[in-house]
Curated annotation (Swiss-Prot):
Origin species: Geobacillus kaustophilus (strain HTA426)
Protein family per UniProt: Belongs to the UPF0340 family.
HAMAP family cross-referenced by the UniProt entry: UPF0340 (MF_00800)
Origin superkingdom: Bacteria
Protein name, per record: UPF0340 protein GK3370
Amino acid sequence: MTEWRQQWQAILHEFRKQAPLGRGDVVVIGCSTSEVLGERIGTAGSMDVAAMLFAELDAWRRETGIALAFQCCEHLNRALVVERETAKTHGLEIVSVVPVPKAGGAMAAYAYRKFADPVVVEAIRADAGIDIGHTLIGMHLKPVAVPVRVSVKHIGSACVTLAKTRPKLIGGARAVYSLENPNDSCSF
């Protein structure tokens, strides 16, 4: 577990440098603790692994004010555990379910038990995301997702994929994306 914690800390350190997030920004976390253990997703969930991962994420949350959203497994349609305040702030519809390790996944179940005022919502548009073990978090990211590359690519046996998001660039060839080089010309 010590080696996994060190891997996790290294991943989060690099991710935070490349995706500077602050108060109110939402980070979605999808995690198969089974995959961390080297087992097939959904077969060997571990509350101990979930606790280790959660501790580092919670420290990041307390330091920066980010909001965490923990994706449940497919048995709960990949719904998300968030704090009630996050649901209110983002206008998210709360659904009635309590995640457990066998229906929701160990990570979401653990987060539900550790949050101050947890609720479950069906969807969110997160500013960034962490996918541990191919849990498919893309449905919960804002467009446009941008991959974040880090030097440590695994926690235990689980592949880790990271993403941040950026606003869409709209407008075509004459569009301006910075006031430093305005295209003020009206000629065609």
